[in-house]
Amino acid sequence: TVIFDSGLEKNFLYPVAFQMGMRIVTEEETGKEGFSIVEEDREYKDTVQKLFTFIEESPSQYHAVDTMRKHLEAAGYEQLLESGAWKLKSGGKYYVIRSGSSLIAFRIPAQDSQNYCGFQIVASHSDSPSFKIKTNPEMNVEEHYVKLNVEKYGGMLCAPWFDRPLSVAGRLIVKENNRLVTKLVNVDRDLVMIPNLAIHMNREANKGYDYNIQKDMLPLYGCGEAKGKFMKQIAEAANVEEDAILASDLFLYNRMKGSIWGACEEFISSPKLDDLQCAFSSLEAFLQSEEPLPSENVQANEQSEVDGKNVINEKNVINGKSIPVHCVFDNEEVGSGTKQGAASTFLADTLIRINHAMGRDEAGYRQSIANSFMLSADNAH
C-alpha cells in the first residue's frame, strides 16, 4: 500500500492508480492518515476498453481534443473562447481550446469561490510520435507505384512502424461560403503501409539498421494509377470539394487496435499510449473528482516545512476549495514551443483570467500560484 498526503485531491491520484492497476481508498476505509493506493481486486477490462475506445476516436491530436470536448460537454462543461469575455460563476464548469489541439478544463468551487486556494493541475499532451504528411506528398517511383512524402514527427521507435496497416488523419483549412473554416478528417480504412524489404534484399536487417526516413520509411500508397488521388480521397473523407482545401495538417496513424494480454491479462498494448493514456486517465480523474470526498473539509491554510523544503499537505491545500485544472497541450513531441504547446502562454493566460474573473488582484494570483500543485503526466517518461 502506498500512502499519499491527504492534501492531494483525487484528481492527482487517479492517473497514478490507473497506470498501476490499482485504486484509491480514503483514510476512512483504511484507518490510516491520507489517501491510499491499493491493489485493485475487480476487473479492470471495462476501464481499459474505455481507454482503447478513446484512442481509436483520437487518430490525431485534433481528434483527441475534440473527443475530450465531447466528454466535457456531456458532463455539463461550457466552452469559453479566448477571444471573448469570461463571466465565471460559483460551481461553474468550463473548458477552453487553443488552436484546436490543446485544451484546458477547470471547475470553480461551489462555495466561497472568490477565496479559492490555488490550482491543482494535471498536464499531459495530445500529440504522439508519428509521420507528418508533406504538402503535395505523392511521389511517383519509376512510374510503377506511388509513395507519400513524409517527415518524422517526434521521438519515435522506427521499427514498429513497418508492416502495419496505417491511415491518415488531421485537420484541413477549407474555404466555405467565403470563410475559412477548419474540418477534421480521418480516412477510416487501411490506406498505406511502410513495407519491410525481404530478408534476401537486406541481409543486414537483423544486425541493426540506421533507418533513413526519406529513403526507407516513405509509406506505399498505391500503384502508378494512384497518382493524383490522395487529396481527392482526403476531400472525400472530409466531405468537402478538393479545390476548397487551402491547407492541411495531416499525420499517419497506426490502425491496429489495443489489446489486453499476458498470462493473467496484466499487460496492455496500443498505439498512442504516449501520451493518450495519460490524457485519458487525467480526464477520467478530473471528471470523477467532481464527487465529494468523504473526508472533505476546510482546514487552515498554513505552510509546512520538511527538511527545510516547502511541501504541499493538508495544511496548505484545502479539499474542495482549490480549482482542479485538466490540461492537454500539443507539440510536446517537438519541443512544446508552439502557440499551443506547454511552453506557450496558454496555461498562464487561463489561470490569470480565472483569477481576474473571480475578482482577485495580482497579489491574490501570486498567492494562488504559491498554493498550487502541478503533475506532469507523460507515461513514456
Where are these regions (language model features)?
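N-terminal hydrophobic/helix-forming segments and targeting peptides
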Residues: 2-381
